[in-house]
Swiss-Prot record:
It comes from Arthrobacter globiformis. InterPro entries: ADC_synthase, Anth_synth_I-like, Anth_synth_I_N, Anth_synth_I_PabB, Chorismate_C. Its EC number is 4.1.3.27. This is Anthranilate synthase component 1. It catalyses: chorismate + L-glutamine = anthranilate + pyruvate + L-glutamate + H(+). Belongs to the anthranilate synthase component I family. Residues 511-531 have a biased composition (Low complexity).
């Protein structure tokens, strides 16, 4: 608590840092134990393009220590016609066109900064999403499906101003990144004063009261199931599963993950969808990103992903392959029985082992020889509505590799493609009728100190122009049941779709709008009045 209320670094230290770093987080920590991440998002972001909220609920539902609220991004790296494209003002020396994944690598290198001890794991960097189609810049895939959504392949915000809510000690760290945009040694003092002014502006904004509505649910006007549309109808989807099985029998792949998209109208705000999803399906990766494409069309990504693709912290590289699932039981005994059933399912175990081997192979490309190890194998982890078989594969980053190289080696997750990955990717282009968009890509950040935390974009909704799009898939093997696999896609898509549906029924209330029955004559009437 000794550092509360002190802007850091001071001008002299800032001058020293600026001599060898193009990005310096100027920050102020305040005690704000009455604030919540949602409240801070309302005050600082308000759903404007380039803003975000990232949170994490640990296994068991407890919220993790940090929540990250992005208030302003001076530039966003995205794509236009398959080429790198910047919105806003890109820093000097970074690619402004060409291969977008090269632009990610070169931007990280150009703005690489020191690691600041004692700060949260993320203070500056690129944050957003890389969609499934990004893989086409790393793999030779020549037959892409129809691009019906016309979504950018990626969108990564260059974080300028942000707040970090510390759930453990009740503080908020306000950060204004001083970014040397013109790569010049001039105007260093001016950059510090500008960052200090922005920190003070953030403080003023979180100190200003903002209406925080209290909400209740009204009965939904439309039935949930009736409001969902399948972009790929079930008979056609089942036929694709058959073709996937033929490829497995022919020895082309061991497994392939065939997905389909669901759609529905969305009249709710992205924040309300996130609020519902946060309440009903807390997961290790919770996020809302507000973005725009090169044509100025705004869209949002709201998600609740249980699965990391990969994290890099210093030299430590970690991935958590997840494969195999059961719903949570309604009682403790039922939950235990389902977990035992999952552990005993030979098909689930075989698929999981295959994906653990794939993760080991991916990490071996970028880690020190002999350092890749499985530290957790096929253990049941329970989430709010589902349980999974989870393993942990770790390695030590090779001296010649960086976080970008780890991303390239592991993207996309084998749990979303199948194995062997190269052939599975080509097979998916043949079987799926539309490009996947955000589904199966990643969301998260690459920071300028060299770390990375990327979640797989599943259990996520794309919200754009009054529509919600949710995609889900299931890994099939030779003896898979097609109807069961089809139902699995429905089950996996249910959480974000229900969040969209429920958010449309949220209604803000005031004391004057609350009504109560005039009299209560029996227990039955209480039930009726509250039903």
């Amino acid at each position: 608590m000794q550092d509360l209320g002190i802007i850091s670094p001071g001008l002299e230290e800032f001058r020293e840092l600026a001599a060898h770093s193009r990005v310096i987080p100027v920050r102020l920590k305040v005690l704000a134990d009455a604030e919540t991440p949602i409240g801070l998002y309302r005050k600082l972001a308000q759903g404007q393009p380039g803003t975000f909220l990232m949170e994490s609920a640990a296994v068991g539902g407890a919220w993790s220590r940090y929540s990250f609220i992005g208030s302003r991004s001076r530039a966003t790296l995205t794509t236009k016609d398959g080429q790198a494209h910047w919105l806003g003002e890109p820093p000097a020396g970074v690619p402004v066109d060409g291969n977008p994944v090269d632009a990610i690598r070169d931007t990280i290198e150009a703005l690489r900064t020191d690691r600041f001890d004692g700060l949260p794991p993320f203070t500056s960097g690129l944050v957003g999403f890389l969609g499934w189609e990004t893989v086409r810049h790393w793999e030779k895939l020549t037959r892409p499906p129809e691009d019906d959504l016309q979504l950018p392949e990626l969108a990564l915000n260059l974080v300028t101003d942000m707040a970090v809510h510390d759930n453990m000690d009740g503080t908020v760290l306000l950060i204004a990144n001083a970014i040397n945009f013109d790569n010049s040694s001039e105007r260093v003092d001016e950059a510090w004063h500008d960052a200090v002014a922005r920190v003070k502006e953030l403080l003023a904004r979180i100190s200003t009261p903002v209406l925080q509505p209290v909400s209740v649910l009204e009965p939904a006007a439309l039935d949930f199931a009736a409001s969902v549309q399948e972009r790929w109808n079930e008979p056609e989807y089942l036929a694709a599963l058959d073709r996937g099985k033929e490829a497995i029998v022919d020895g082309e792949v061991f497994q392939v993950v065939i997905s389909r998209r669901f759609e529905m109208e969305c009249g709710a705000s992205p924040l309300d969808v996130y609020r519902v999803l946060r309440n009903t399906n807390p997961s290790p990766y919770m996020y809302i990103f507000s973005l725009e494409d090169a044509a100025g069309r705004q869209y949002s990504i709201v998600g609740s992903s249980p699965e990391a693709l990969v994290t890099v912290t210093g030299e430590d590289v970690i991935t958590h392959p997840i494969a195999g699932s059961r719903p949570r039981g309604k009682t403790v005994d039922a939950d235990k029985a389902l977990a035992e059933e999952l552990l005993a399912d030979q098909k689930e175990r075989a698929e999981h082992l295959m994906l653990v081997d794939l993760s080991r192979n991916d990490l071996s490309k970028v880690c020190v020889a002999g350092s890749v190890d499985v530290t957790q194998f096929m253990e049941v982890e329970r989430f709010s509505h589902i349980m999974h078989l989870v393993s942990t594969v770790v390695g030590r980053l090779a001296p010649t590799a960086k976080a970008y190289d780890v991303l390239k080696a592991t993207f996309p997750a084998g749990t979303l493609s199948g194995a062997p990955k190269p052939r599975a990717l080509r097979l998916l282009d043949e079987l799926e009728p539309h490009r996947r968009g955000i589904y199966g890509g990643v969301v998260g950040y690459l920071d300028f100190a060299g770390d990375m935390d990327m979640a797989i974009a599943i259990r996520s909704a794309l919200l754009r122009e009054g529509r919600a799009y949710v995609q889900a898939g299931g890994g099939i093997v030779a003896d898979s049941s097609n109807p069961a696999e089809a139902q699995e896609t429905v089950n996996k898509a249910a959480a974000p779709l229900r969040a969209v549906h429920t958010a449309g029924s949220l209604h803000n209330i005031t004391p004057d709008s609350v009504s109560a029955p005039d009299s209560v004559s029996s227990p039955d009437s209480v039930t009726e009045a509250n039903s």
